[in-house]
Amino acid sequence: MAAATLSFGPEREAEPAKEARVVGSELVDTYTVYVIQVTDGNHEWTIKHRYSDFHDLHEKLVAERKIDKSLLPPKKIIGKNSRSLVEKRERDLEVYLQTLLTTFPDVAPRVLAHFLHFHLYEVNGVTAALAEELFEKGEQLLGAGEVFAIRPLQLYAITEQLQQGKPTCASGDAKTDLGHILDFTCRLKYLKVSGTEGPFGTSNIKEQLLPFDLSIFKSLHQVEISHCDAKHIRGLVTSKPTLATMSVRFSATSMKEVLAPEASEFDEWEPEGTATLGGPVTAIIPTWQALTTLDLSHNSICEIDESVKLIPKIEYLDLSHNGLRVVDNLQHLYNLVHLDLSYNKLSSLEGVHTKLGNVKTLNLAGNFLESLSGLHKLYSLVNVDLRDNRIEQLDEVKSIGSLPCLERLTLLNNPLSIIPDYRTKVLSQFGERASEICLDDVATTEKELDTVEVLKAIQKAKDVKSKLSNTEKKAGEDFRLPPAPCIRPGGSPPAAPASASLPQPILSNQGIMFVQEEALASSLSSTDSLPPEDHRPIARACSDSLESIPAGQVASDDLRDVPGAVGGVSPDHAEPEVQVVPGSGQIIFLPFTCIGYTATNQDFIQRLSTLIRQAIERQLPAWIEAANQREEAHGEQGEEEEEEEEEEDVAENRYFEMGPPDAEEEEGSGQGEEDEEDEDEEAEEERLALEWALGADEDFLLEHIRILKVLWCFLIHVQGSIRQFAACLVLTDFGIAVFEIPHQESRGSSQHILSSLRFVFCFPHGDLTEFGFLMPELCLVLKVRHSENTLFIISDAANLHEFHADLRSCFAPQHMAMLCSPILYGSHTTLQEFLRQLLTFYKVAGGSQERSQGCFPVYLVYSDKRMVQTPAGDYSGNIEWASCTLCSAVRRSCCAPSEAVKSAAIPYWLLLTSQHLNVIKADFNPMPNRGTHNCRNRNSFKLSRVPLSTVLLDPTRSCTQPRGAFADGHVLELLVGYRFVTAIFVLPHEKFHFLRVYNQLRASLQDLKTVVISKNPSAKPRNQPAKSRASAEQRLQETPADAPAPAAVPPTASAPAPAEALAPDLAPVQAPGEDRGLTSAEAPAAAEAPAAAEAPAAAEAPAAAEAPAAAEAPAAAEAPAPAEAPAAAEAPAAAEAPAAAEAPAAAEAPASAEAPAPNQAPAPARGPAPARGPAPAGGPAPAEALAQAEVPAQYPSERLIQSTSEENQIPSHLPVCPSLQHIARLRGRAIIDLFHNSIAEVENEELRHLLWSSVVFYQTPGLEVTACVLLSSKAVYFILHDGLRRYFSEPLQDFWHQKNTDYNNSPFHVSQCFVLKLSDLQSVNVGLFDQYFRLTGSSPTQVVTCLTRDSYLTHCFLQHLMLVLSSLERTPSPEPVDKDFYSEFGDKNTGKMENYELIHSSRVKFTYPSEEEVGDLTYIVAQKMADPAKNPALSILLYIQAFQVVTPHLGRGRGPLRPKTLLLTSAEIFLLDEDYIHYPLPEFAKEPPQRDRYRLDDGRRVRDLDRVLMGYYPYPQALTLVFDDTQGHDLMGSVTLDHFGEMPGGPGRVGQGREVQWQVFVPSAESREKLISLLARQWEALCGRELPVELTG
């Protein structure tokens, strides 16, 4: 553009005239917009205005500049949008605008300039707008020191203004004076110039091509330029003395354009201050004296030219995202510390150390580097980023491994980074400094450092061995792994005396789920120091019983699954039966002592290489013969063969072909002949390559067998029959070798296992036809040609993925299409996606929302025997109900098939989700041929889902059962529904991973949970809390023992001394058992591992209890004192209580002090008593409750045992089930044992209080069930009646939940328990007269109301609850706790008490009833009366929760009880239905409940009462109120019209003549006496004589 070529010289052409043309119009809605094109020299831009805009402009110009008023075309009212008018108006408006521009040729008026957008695009307008802006805000910007952003167009306009030589204030407006800009630019320190790509706005101006001058900026310290052309920037060099930071992006093609623009005028130049050598120098250029930071990234710079001589003080240089190919000329930058050369085109670093002397941070990411040899002398390097390069060899890291100052290294996204154990191999290159290196932004872990130490030791041994290789070439061939503690043969090198056993293996992160690394490391290290007897398994009887089972003893019919056990979802699915051959009739598992031996263990690799070489020599003739047979089979194939046989042969030998099989089979016969010729050639090449690569030269084989990966796994080998064994798969560069761990050796030491590895078979890569995942992340499938072998490999996810990736790398990319099976999953599919597909296939509701938390391969052993309980608690012959220990269960499953014991002979998968345990059975039948995969889809898996709440850990396992390495490390006993199941984990550490995940999920469940209650408390069943069991298992694993398998050794067996040390701690736990008569056979039970696991809980309890006892003793002492205060003082005390609620004493005192005694019944004139206090209880009740609530000095204290025994009396009116009856019969310490053995979920939990009550849940508001409420130091447990199970649990129709016919004779009860953790408790609402209380959590599932119907029971529970909460530490609530002044103090002068809310120190809110609630109840009752105006003001005398006895049908006993609220006023008595659970509304409630809080059921006048009958039938102390049903009474006229009608199932009324009977049962004796007393007093006041009270039978 011409504008871009204007020079800055003094001579300039005359300014061209401006033009404005109306080039068109547009119709917008109901008006027309005119398109105007403005031209200013070579600049053009477009604007749009409607006629009204012109009219407004004209009015302002007429007023300000006195132009002709008739110059603008007139308005039109009719036809203003007609085409003819619009065209005429376009011409008139163009003449109007042109006339205005002619009238004001130099500087347009302000309104006209804005109308034509001169302030955006025209030189004078742009400078005027900028000057006005800086006039107003310039000083503020300079004072704040902010970066000022300016556009290239604005700089261009300033430059043009200065070169025109016109007055700085041509418009006459002082605000637009150019001097404001110049004054601002002289003082500005921080500048940012940002251009745009393409035209600016609606103009044709390209900012990046506009020239401008920066010499007007005299004080710049920092400048940032982007999207400009550096060739057109002038004056930047004037800031050399002051500029410290400069950034030029998307603007330059060379460094010289920015740093030395004046150098283009000279042939030779030198920087100022350098000594010349007498050459032809034509110019001396000043240096950038203050520049320390230079950013030239994102430009098009291709070389680092000599202009860098001008920036000698530079410290930070960024040249990233350019096109640099060579690092040059940086030797002049002596102060350079940080250099960024990322994302250039560097391919070599040769000699870079001569140019980068003191660089500390070097970024070379995103280049083409393959070698790092040029960095080996950069001794000052601290941080090097080499990501996204082409570094392949590990040896390249050696170049930087010796740099003394290096701390951070990044090698991500290099070919090097996909090497197995990449991190440890890289870190090993740094030697002793490995701990100081942060690799790939991840700090080095202790585990990695241990691995590095092992690698260093291996490398040192290799170096020593290489020095002796000249004299002992064949020493490695005679190497064998001797069983410990044998001594190495004498021919071994003397330089490695520590090699008498294998080095300590490298343990992967995936292999250790739950166990401390130190314990495992010690178990996998040398075992020579151990005596021989320490190698034998601990549970000798268990091991012998398992290993003595002969092969084939189990019939295949007896090993099939019980119908519906796992495959119950699809019973019609037919499968081809395969003969199941268990390995020697035993349970197979992978021992953990060998999994640490990987491909990095050189001695182990040498052993495997020798075995593989010998196997190849034996199998080589068979492989060559098979290749020849394939060649002959192709030659003998003729045209007379049937098409199906041809297809089979072609499909059998097509593993080098491309494309899917079906597509190629549809091609023509000519193409088929060509394919056969290609196959013949490839088969011949394969055979020749096989003979060459696998020749008889032993030295060649030994030297060239390279082991890529070692995978320890559980293997299912299918070849006509199914065979299972623990295996070691070895992936080499030629094929795969399979080794078996003999089952009888699986319990030995790692030395013994490795020395007894038995070779099974091997096959080259070419024989592999398909491979993929049967289940993603869990089971890898390899299908081998010829022998139709299928290998199902089960291992942990990480090792399987690594093995799969290494196997894929052995094949060319074009061959992978044939090896990927359509019926198997690829590596990209996750377990979560597989679970979603499986649940969708089985149409599980909400299956897409479930997330897998872990999946574990296990054997499942379970019993189906139905036997009755034997006398005296002897369950030794009972299969179903006996302690289902491993030895007995497995022995029966393998040796006694006639007793209907079923065993899963093939592993299942236990998949945990947040709510369910999913049991998955896979089809291990032989894989179908390619092309026939339509018959195999998701129904290859059978699924059974069990709610996680019904799964328990070994609920009845006896603690007398001896344990061992196998049982402790692999066996877990479960109660799933009503079935005992023994899960045998086939992989190491999976049991502890399962326990960890299970405990987390079980603890997070908010629904009902299954608990098991033993019927024989003296037997002390092994049913401790889940976390206690997990910690016990964990302690077994963490024991620092010297045995080869520390996870398997119980403390009593591995270390007798610690067992004796634990005896004093266990004494308090065992003493009560001895008092109950522990026999000599039962005594050792308390000393076994389960009892030891519970010992810390008993030992730590007293110490933990002392602090709460001391802290809350004042509260217990001071609380009874206010109880003696008169009633008149109760209201102020209650009102002031919240102010002191922070102290435990003050918080608990009002709750126990403000209630009147039972004998102080309030008179009607005094008002409702419950409004004054939350806890009306007996006089001595508060003192007794607080005395009982004190934290005992020793747990369990005698007071606690005595109080729980006294409180463990179930009310006679509550319905019970067998499990609750059993609990109610317990006394003394048996209650404490029940809590810890069957109920508690936390290890150090303490029982504090027991309460029997009926409860109502928020989710089932119409159902009231019996519950035993146990308050502990951590939670509130509700053991519920069995009737609630069907409302909360899922349908229980499968195998797991079928009760046996002799279930009632079992030694335990299966019950339901609801747990409300105290940490989830948010508020406690207390009902009127303390008749009930509601516990509210954060969700609807955590809201439950306890209907004690007894103020004393409520009061005791709340006192204990407050005491327990005081010992808990609660984090501050996220909501603001402080209230504003008016809400906190504004209502104190009213004299009325609002809802009494007590904020406990634990942030739990206790809400007590107020006068307002009593007033609401009074109002509701008054509205139901026939004529409220005639009746005196109601005054509630008594409010109690009672039952109305429904008259039973003929021939039946007791009638059912219906919960009712009985209300006694001064003249009436009412029965109401009350909603206890929904009111007051919880915080999470979105809408009001559908039910009203009170619904009046019936009402009678007290004076109509004829007599009161009291008897023991049908319920003890039941009351029958007999009323005279007088005609025309004025109470409840609309409600009681049908008194004499028959109402089947209605309330218990008996209408004989004119009498109506209420049969009322009041559970609380105190409330019952108070009702009779008040009723008699009111009746006497109304009738003038005593109320007749009659006793009946």
From Swiss-Prot:
User: Is Phosphoprotein set as a keyword in this record?
Assistant: yes
Point out the coiled-coil segments of this chain: 624-694
The UniProt entry annotates sequence repeats at 1081-1086, 1087-1092, 1093-1098, 1099-1104, 1105-1110, 1111-1116, 1123-1128, 1129-1134, 1135-1140, 1141-1146
Instruction: Identify the stretch(es) annotated as 10 X 6 AA tandem repeat of A-E-A-P-A-A.
Output: 1081-1146
Name any GO cellular component annotation: plasma membrane
The lineage's top-level taxon is: Eukaryota
Which parts of this chain are annotated as the region Necessary for homooligomerization and targeting to endosomes? Answer: 121-695
Subcellular location(s) per record: Cell membrane; Cytoplasm; Early endosome; Recycling endosome
Q: Where is this region: Interaction with LIMK?
A: 661-869
GO molecular-function annotation terms?
Answer: identical protein binding; integrin binding; phosphatidylinositol binding
Q: Where are stretches of biased composition, namely Acidic residues?
A: 638-650, 662-685
Q: Which residues carry this modification: Phosphoserine?
A: 543, 545, 548, 1373
Instruction: From the UniProt record, list the LRR repeat ranges.
Output: 290-311, 313-334, 335-356, 358-379, 380-401, 405-426
Q: In which tissues is it expressed?
A: Highly expressed in brain and kidney. Moderately expressed in heart, liver, lung and skeletal muscle. Not detected in spleen and testis.
Residues with PTM Phosphothreonine: 1371
Q: Where is this region: Necessary for binding to phosphoinositide-3-P?
A: 1-134
Subunit: Homooligomer. Interacts with GRB2. Interacts with PIK3R1; probably associates with the PI3-kinase complex. Interacts with IRS4. Found in a complex with ITGA5 and PAK1. Found in a complex with LIMK1 and PAK1. Interacts with ITGA5 (via cytoplasmic domain); this interaction is direct. Interacts with PAK1 (via kinase domain); this interaction is direct and is increased upon activation of PAK1. Interacts with LIMK1 (via PDZ and kinase domain); this interaction is direct. Interacts with LIMK2; this interaction depends on LIMK2 activity. Interacts with RAC1 (activated state).
Sum up the protein's function in the record's words: Acts either as the functional imidazoline-1 receptor (I1R) candidate or as a membrane-associated mediator of the I1R signaling. Binds numerous imidazoline ligands that induces initiation of cell-signaling cascades triggering to cell survival, growth and migration. Its activation by the agonist rilmenidine induces an increase in phosphorylation of mitogen-activated protein kinases MAPK1 and MAPK3 in rostral ventrolateral medulla (RVLM) neurons that exhibited rilmenidine-evoked hypotension.
PANTHER family per record: NISCHARIN (PTHR15454:SF35), NISCHARIN RELATED (PTHR15454)
Name of the protein? Nischarin
